[in-house]
A protein has these predicted regions:
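Alpha/propeptide regions of enzymes that mature by internal proteolysis
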Residues: 1-110
Length: 110
């Protein structure tokens, strides 16, 4: 059964897929936004009293990286940030990422 979508839903953007999992009793979860194979332009605004991030500095203007392959939004502190590693492994298997000549490196800020 297809879930109902609404105008403005991120899943209505061509080439974007979203997945989510949570553990309600542990009060944590993870959302993954996958971009089309060639990636998408990313941006970031880090806020909060004790934010934890991974690879978000890559998104600053003027850096070598122009596109991201996925974005991971997670809870659970450092363990939540490690979820980006699993997304990177998946994207590597799918041959997605920045072409470094000898390999493709998936760009997955969290």
């Amino acid at each position: 059964m297809m879930e109902k979508t609404y105008p403005g839903d991120i899943t209505r953007v061509h080439g974007i897929r979203v997945g989510h999992a949570q553990n309600a009793s542990a009060r944590t979860g993870v959302t993954v936004v996958l971009c089309r194979k060639e990636g998408a332009t990313g941006g970031v605004s880090v806020r909060g009293a004790a934010p934890g991030t991974r690879e978000t500095d890559l998104l600053r203007p003027g850096n070598l990286v122009e596109n991201v392959n996925a974005v991971v939004l997670s809870g659970g502190s450092a363990y939540g940030l490690d979820a980006a590693g699993g997304v990177m492994r998946y994207l590597e298997q799918m041959a997605c990422g920045m072409d470094m000549g000898v390999a493709r490196v998936p760009i997955v800020p969290a």
